[in-house]
A protein has these predicted regions:
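Conserved functional loop/turn residues at catalytic and ligand-binding sites
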Residues: 86
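Positively charged n-region of N-terminal signal peptides that target proteins for export
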Residues: 1-5
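Exported/periplasmic ABC-transporter solute-binding proteins
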Residues: 20-72, 76-83, 92-96, 101, ...
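Bacterial N-terminal signal peptides
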Residues: 8-16
Length: 296
């Protein structure tokens, strides 16, 4: 689990910077070449936060006069912020809603990942689920509160919950369970609750260094064909690399596999935003795989 971000995901400096108005310009350097300078702000999905940090670090190395501030608070917050002109770019882990498009939101696909069902590694139900897989019907019953398991969902408006709900044919507000803020919060709750089951973005379900499931958490396999058993071609959860390959090949269902987006309010005019988006969708794609994401 990406513990290094927990202390900084809620409070960032993006609003402080945005209050002064975002700046960006292209100027001439001492050698006569064009130099990009200024700063931009991003807010939104926990799912994209770790990858966005890597993109920002490399972009800053390429353009030392550019600063990028990033904060995570859920896809819903990102959309709200960008449409209110509080940030330049929203990180969004779901499809845009019609009303968001009507307000001028423009989405740029930048990566692909998935939401997975997660469970306490010592949950008594886990052994059976390894044999049968979790069918859509079973998952629906769990998040309707019809089982004895302790069910967790998200309390914040987020792409992960909307994506998992879409897999069940529902909306986020239909999901029953204990609401917890953020991906790290759900993962920590499951680690402490032997009877717990929930869902996470894959970046928090797996350890980013070992690519194995996060300590104390297990990944619940999906019975994709609904035949009541986990077939050989449905077994791809042991490592993050196996799951990423399954997502890329379409073996893991969509939803809960999904595209991830950077979103702007209308066509961006800030040259730093324009160049950053170009970078992310071209050279920046090489960082997707090592970070646990599928490139577009």
């Amino acid at each position: 689990m990406r513990k290094e971000i927990i202390g900084m995901i809620v409070i960032g400096t993006s609003l402080l910077l945005a209050s002064c108005g975002s700046r960006g310009e292209v100027k001439r350097g001492a050698d006569g070449k064009q130099v990009l300078s200024g700063y931009i702000t991003l807010s939104g999905a926990f799912a994209l936060y770790p990858l966005a940090i890597q993109w920002a670090d490399e972009f800053h190395r390429l353009h030392p006069d550019v600063d990028i501030d990033i904060s995570a608070g859920g896809a819903g917050k990102g959309i709200t912020d960008v449409l209110a002109d509080q940030v330049d770019i929203a990180m969004v882990s779901r499809e845009l809603k019609p009303q968001e498009k009507e307000k001028g939101a423009l989405a740029y696909a930048v990566a692909k990942d998935a939401v997975v069902a997660t469970i306490n590694a010592n949950n008594p139900a886990y052994k059976d689920l390894l044999k049968t897989g979790l069918s859509q019907k079973q998952a629906t019953a769990i998040w309707e509160g019809k089982t004895k398991m302790n069910v967790y969902t998200r309390s914040d408006a987020c792409g992960a919950a909307e994506t998992w709900a879409a897999f069940l044919g529902k909306k986020q507000e239909d999901l029953k369970g204990t609401g917890v803020f953020g991906d790290p919060g759900v993962a920590e709750s499951l680690q402490k609750d032997v009877n717990g089951i929930g869902f996470n973005n894959i970046g928090y379900a797996y350890n980013d260094k070992t690519h194995k499931p996060t300590k104390g958490i297990a990944i619940v396999p999906i019975d994709v064909n609904g035949n009541g058993k986990l077939d050989a071609d449905e077994k791809f959860y042991d490592t993050l690399d196996e799951l990423m390959d399954a997502i890329a090949k379409g073996k893991y269902p969509a939803p809960p596999a999904r595209n991830l987006y950077l979103v702007t309010a209308g066509k961006p005019k800030n040259p730093v935003v324009v160049e950053f988006l170009k970078y992310v969708r071209t050279k920046g794609q090489r960082l997707n795989g090592p970070a646990g994401f599928v490139h577009i």
